[in-house]
Amino acid sequence: VRAKKYNSYTNTGSGTSVKNILNRDFSTSRINQKWTTDVTEFKVCGRRIYLSGIMDMHSKEIIAYSLSFTPNMKLIMNMIKMAFRKMRNPKGVIIHSDQGWHYRHKSYKGFLKKKKAIQSMSRKGNCLDNAVIENFWGILKTEWFYLNKFDSIESFLEQLESYIHYFNYERDSSVLCYRTPIEVRYTNMIA
């Protein structure tokens, strides 16, 4: 059982990068203002599993995620479509990512444009520009992945779903004034 840093830049035939609008300004005043997304890789039972996730920078909620045995466009598009459905198609949200080929692909860029989202990308090879989601990957792997053994892919998937539910609904954080991501989201929706 091993987690590995996934390098998504390798497919250079996919579109161009966009400006780093976020420029490490992770501050927010409300939900659906800034989202951050990335892909990470796990090795479980001799198979690679790719996890694409998207987080609201205000609530720190994992809004949506998808899994695949291959790092393809379906992985990314399933995740981003799920996020927009769940959050009721917010307009003007800044969506920040690294410069991975998925995020430079015309189908991803076209979807964001159709949804009136603003795309932002980290500088090439600079993980600190996407520190919010990178920090979550570290928490996920430290608190859950490295502490568990998985006797099957199914076991991994079930436990991952449970951990993300725990992270969103039960795990409070000092950054959120000791509230959970879901508490922050619902407080914001009422305000």
Predicted ranges, named:
Residues 1-30, 126, 180-188:
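Basic, flexible linker segments flanking DNA-binding modules
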Residues 9-13, 97-99, 105-106, 121-141, ...:
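RNase H-like two-metal-ion nuclease catalytic core shared by retroviral integrases
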Residues 14, 18, 32, 51, ...:
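Hydrophobic (often cysteine-bearing) scaffold residues that line and stabilize catalytic clefts
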Residues 22, 38, 54, 60, ...:
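Mobile genetic element proteins and their domesticated derivatives, centered on retroelements
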Residues 24, 28-63, 69-71:
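An active-site-proximal beta-strand-loop segment
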Residues 61-65, 119-122, 146-147:
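Short small-residue beta-strand/loop micro-motif enriched in glycine and branched aliphatics
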Residues 66-88, 94:
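Active-site beta-loop-alpha junctions of metal-dependent nucleic acid enzymes
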Residues 106, 113-117, 139-191:
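C-terminal domain-tail junction helix/linker
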